């Protein structure tokens, strides 16, 4: 058994030696005792029996190693070590594979060659063809002593429920044999040569074929896991085969499903250290990627997500000679946080409050876990705060409150936001108006409010005589909490003496009046600066002949800014 993995030479009675497969060395220090059935390396100290050797070489559990050795020896093991699968089920699949491979020459072979596959690759992946007839496999089985029951159990026949007649399940299809991670032939996938539907057809669920637990190509790709090779999960059989042919030998594919929790558990058990999800850029591909990311939450391996830059699937990209595009996609894969944030941003945008709301709700399921050990959730919250300009403490308050179950309003967002300088000035102005609403009459009605909550209050507060009048307007609405906070802040200026209640009220009102004047000047300056910035950007794309007029406008605005500043200093 060891000799299948290590080149061994005699080293004395009952002993063989070779280069250790578990560490790099130039002089053989690995020995096998053929009489006792043990191995030992004098270099890295690895040792054990045949089961331990297979476990370590193949990254298998004891049960999987036992099944592999039992299959090799032709022994059927007790069901407690694994699923109860009759050995002849695998043999029936092998019989069908021989039948399919014998019918490959012809249109099916031409199709595969046309997809860029070499004859060597076609042979390595054991591709075949199911003839377009109703009972070709069934007729052959009858001559070879394979029963209808066995074919039905293997999912190779379909029974008509009305008349009980059986016929071949796979007809007129290129056949892809599907092996589990131990290399056992558990089923097939079939693809039509034309555009008829369904394009793909798999073996139905059987004792051996569990679609949610299988990854096509894993029997070949797993050999690199011991050296830390990265697995690349793609969408289809042809993607896997083309990737392997072009040297991307870590490619595997799920069988028409997104990555599942069972897949994640299997990959962990096999010692996977890193995987990349490389699905198509369409809506289905995005959905499969996000679903796959959901299933590997908490996995011990690193997960990234990417897609081919050209928008093609890997097989078509490689057929077009775009090996570089595949390498670029693999090199540029995004971690879970960056991928989710990018996907949500591209889907909804963050230029509007509606877009921000949708992005936040999209990210909520993954960032609401407050377990300190969930680093991804923490990073997701940090990314959301940075992207949307949200205060971290405000985001946590929202996540832990019932508010997250409601639709986010503009005011919710405003309350969570890290306000810009202009918005801070607007909130400061509103703070003072809550001290004395009559000061509202002093405001320039042309001011463009940036903060949505401020805009709503300013419009609704016209004619209010007291702060209570304003609060009554927004009683029970999202703006109420913001107004209460600002009202307390406006009256607690800190620098005002509270010698007497009457004197305090006079000082607060006087302070508020001066503050309104000052803040209004600041807002005017902010608005002028915004206009200057827009004109400067416009200047970069303006023909030289038209730049003089823009420069003149910029100079005039800058003079207006200086005039506002002088007015403030003189007041």
Swiss-Prot record:
CDD domains named in the record: TOPRIM_DnaG_primases
* One Gene Ontology term of the molecular function aspect: zinc ion binding
A GO cellular component entry from the record: DNA-directed RNA polymerase complex
Manner of cofactor binding, per the entry note: Binds 1 zinc ion per monomer.
Gene Ontology process terms (BP) = DNA replication, synthesis of primer
Q: List UniProt keywords, sorted A-Z.
A: DNA replication, DNA-binding, DNA-directed RNA polymerase, Magnesium, Metal-binding, Nucleotidyltransferase, Primosome, Transcription, Transferase, Zinc, Zinc-finger
Which Cys residues form disulphide pairs? Answer: none
Q: What is its EC number?
A: 2.7.7.101
**Self-association state and partner proteins as the record states:** Monomer. Interacts with DnaB.
In its UniProt entry, what is this protein called? DNA primase
């Amino acid at each position: 058994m060891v000799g299948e993995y290590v080149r061994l030479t005699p080293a004395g009675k009952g002993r063989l030696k070779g280069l250790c497969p578990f560490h790099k060395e130039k002089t053989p220090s690995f020995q096998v005792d053929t009489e006792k059935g043990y191995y030992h390396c004098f270099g890295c100290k690895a040792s054990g029996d045949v089961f331990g050797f297979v476990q370590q070489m193949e990254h298998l559990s004891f049960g999987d190693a036992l099944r592999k050795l039992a299959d090799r020896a032709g022994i059927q093991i007790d069901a407690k070590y694994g699923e109860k699968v009759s050995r002849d089920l695998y043999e029936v699949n092998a019989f069908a594979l021989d039948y399919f491979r014998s019918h490959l020459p012809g249109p099916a072979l031409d199709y595969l060659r046309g997809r860029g596959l070499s004859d060597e690759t076609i042979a390595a992946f054991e591709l075949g063809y199911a003839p377009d007839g109703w009972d070709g496999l069934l007729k052959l089985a009858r001559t070879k002593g394979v029963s209808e029951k066995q074919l039905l159990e293997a999912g190779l026949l379909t029974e008509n429920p009305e008349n009980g007649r059986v016929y071949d399940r796979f007809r007129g299809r290129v056949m892809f044999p599907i092996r589990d991670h131990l290399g056992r032939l558990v089923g097939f996938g079939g693809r039509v040569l034309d555009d008829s539907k369904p394009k793909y057809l798999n073996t139905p669920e059987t004792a051996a074929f569990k679609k949610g637990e299988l990854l096509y190509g894993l029997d070949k790709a797993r050999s690199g896991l011991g050296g830390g090779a990265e697995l690349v999960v793609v969408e289809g059989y042809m993607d896997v085969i083309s990737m392997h042919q072009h040297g991307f030998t870590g490619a595997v594919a799920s069988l028409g499903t997104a990555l599942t929790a069972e897949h994640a558990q299997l990959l962990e058990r096999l010692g996977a250290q890193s995987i990349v999800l490389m699905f198509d850029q369409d809506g289905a591909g995005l959905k499969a990627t996000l679903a796959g990311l959901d299933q590997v939450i908490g996995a011990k391996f690193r997960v990234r997500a990417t897609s081919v830059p050209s928008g093609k699937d890997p097989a078509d990209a490689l057929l077009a000679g775009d090996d570089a595009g595949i390498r670029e996609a693999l090199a540029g894969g995004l971690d879970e946080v960056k991928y989710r944030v990018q996907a949500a941003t591209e889907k909804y945008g963050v230029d509007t409050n509606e877009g921000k709301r949708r992005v936040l709700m999209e990210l909520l399921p993954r960032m609401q876990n407050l377990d300190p050990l969930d680093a991804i959730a923490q990073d997701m919250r940090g990314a959301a705060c940075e992207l949307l300009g949200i205060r971290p403490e405000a985001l946590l308050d929202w996540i832990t409150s019932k508010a997250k179950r409601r639709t986010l309003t503009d005011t919710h967002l405003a309350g969570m936001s890290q306000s810009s300088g202009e918005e801070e000035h607007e909130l400061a102005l509103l703070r003072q108006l809550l001290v004395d609403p009559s000061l509202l009459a002093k405001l320039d009605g042309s001011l463009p409010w940036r903060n949505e909550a401020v805009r709503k209050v300013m419009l609704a507060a016209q004619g209010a005589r007291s702060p209570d009048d304003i609060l009554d307007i927004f009683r029970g609405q999202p703006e109420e909490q913001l107004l209460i906070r600002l009202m307390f802040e406006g009256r607690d200026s800190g620098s005002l003496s509270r010698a007497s209640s009457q004197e305090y009220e006079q000082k607060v009102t006087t302070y508020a009046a001066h503050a309104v004047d000052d803040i209004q000047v600041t807002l005017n300056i902010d608005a002028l600066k915004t206009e200057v910035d827009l004109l400067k950007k416009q200047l970069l794309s303006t023909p030289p002949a038209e730049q003089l007029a823009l420069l003149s406008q910029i100079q005039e605005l800058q003079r207006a800014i200086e005039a506002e500043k002088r007015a403030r200093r003189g007041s």
